[in-house]
């Protein structure tokens, strides 16, 4: 009986230490057209490949994007690398999407958004208002939120350039 109790304790302990990492990115550089749904520039396409290269060893299990050409094109190389579909979400429904992801405890998620939504997503995940809207000129940053147990850690990095310029 003591062995069973000890085994159950270890299973519970290690399952509660399970970590989840959310990788949040603003879409890559978009074309400066008058379109409501612009494509990525050539530089933006390279940034999307850089993001894929950075995420290659991260064991991504889910990919989420808004239904805009620029966000889907940013997520596409990672989607193809992992053979995962791009799950679409509404920028207006991002809070409920985050709540659903937190409830499922799905590991290693990529979420692609916009300059005025990435901050909201990070704040919703961490439960703090640590971020504000990104500058319109900021591309190539990756916001990493790690959950271990009930604690969240947040860091911002610049995605390394791996694609020839």
PLM-predicted stretches and their roles:
Residues 9, 113:
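A conserved hydrophobic position in a structured secondary element of the catalytic/binding core
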Residues 108-112:
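Periplasmic-binding protein-like
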Residues 19-106, 118-121, 128-131, 135-142, ...:
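Active-site-proximal alpha-helix that buttresses catalytic centers in soluble enzyme cores
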Residues 13-16:
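C-terminal motif of bacterial Sec signal peptides marking the signal peptidase cleavage site
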Residues 2-8:
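Sec-dependent signal peptide recognition
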């Amino acid at each position: 009986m003591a062995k069973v109790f000890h085994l159950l304790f270890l299973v519970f302990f290690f399952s509660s230490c399970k970590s989840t990492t959310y990788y949040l990115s603003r879409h890559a550089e978009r074309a400066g057209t008058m379109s409501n749904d612009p494509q990525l520039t050539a530089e933006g396409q390279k940034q999307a490949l850089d993001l894929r290269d950075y995420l290659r060893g991260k064991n991504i299990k889910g990919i989420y994007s808004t239904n805009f050409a620029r966000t889907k094109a940013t997520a596409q190389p990672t989607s193809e690398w992992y053979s995962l579909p791009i799950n679409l979400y509404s920028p207006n429904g991002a809070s409920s999407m985050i709540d659903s992801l937190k409830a499922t405890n799905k590991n290693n998620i990529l979420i692609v958004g916009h300059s005025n939504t990435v901050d909201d997503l990070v704040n919703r995940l961490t439960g703090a208002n640590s971020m504000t809207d990104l500058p319109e000129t900021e591309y190539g940053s990756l916001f990493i939120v790690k959950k271990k147990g009930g604690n969240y850690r947040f860091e911002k990095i610049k995605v390394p350039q791996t694609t020839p310029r």
